[in-house]
Amino acid sequence: MYVVLEGVDGAGKSTQVGLLKNKFKNALFTKEPGGTKIGESLRRIALNENISELARAFLFLSDRAEHVESVIKPALKEKKLIISDRSLISGMAYSEFSSLELNLLATQSILPTKIVLLLIDKEGLKQRLSLKSLDKIENQGIEKLLTIQRNLKTHAYALREKFGCKVLELNAKESVKNLHEKIAAFIKCVV
């Protein structure tokens, strides 16, 4: 089973992934972008270099293609539980150039079985971002991140509608413990 956690920066994905590592010790934990050695290099270029948005989108698509080929496919073949911090959903939400068609090509149509969507309101996002150093995307501001969050939700539900992916939508302002319990139960529930 392939499970992804999605949400804007500051929604608590990394915290939840950390807790899930203790709960699902035999799972394969990965991330996008940067889930492979090549992916780390592509991610660094995409986030830190002054390049066009189109070039950035293709770097992330390249990372996604390599990630699926070298990490996701082998783990699925071994019937492992895969838990990923981000996926193609982020790729589509963060870039105007990253379409579903391009992402299906990059992922060889391998899609998450389950999507955990952590959503946060404007005040919660402001508070959390004030506590960390910001990257190029986060520096675009709260309104930009809220637009990205709406896109994440739209794309997650589009995958549910078109491909049957299961979606668990959570309020990221709930307690870390409550969120963890709900996410763990969602992962354990085999439909």
Curated annotation (Swiss-Prot):
ATP binds at G7, V8, D9, G10, A11, G12, K13, S14. The keyword Protease does not apply. One of its GO terms (molecular function) is ATP binding. InterPro entries: P-loop_NTPase, Thymidylate_kin-like_dom, Thymidylate_kin_CS, Thymidylate_kinase. One of its GO terms (biological process) is dTDP biosynthetic process. Signal peptide: none annotated. It is an enzyme of class 2 (transferase). Its EC number is 2.7.4.9. It comes from Helicobacter pylori (strain P12). One of its GO terms (cellular component) is cytosol. PROSITE patterns: THYMIDYLATE_KINASE. This is Thymidylate kinase. Transmembrane segments: none annotated. Belongs to the thymidylate kinase family. Phosphorylation of dTMP to form dTDP in both de novo and salvage pathways of dTTP synthesis. The lineage of its organism: Bacteria, Pseudomonadati, Campylobacterota, Epsilonproteobacteria, Campylobacterales. Coiled coil: none annotated. It catalyses: dTMP + ATP = dTDP + ADP. Keywords: ATP-binding, Kinase, Nucleotide biosynthesis, Nucleotide-binding, Transferase.
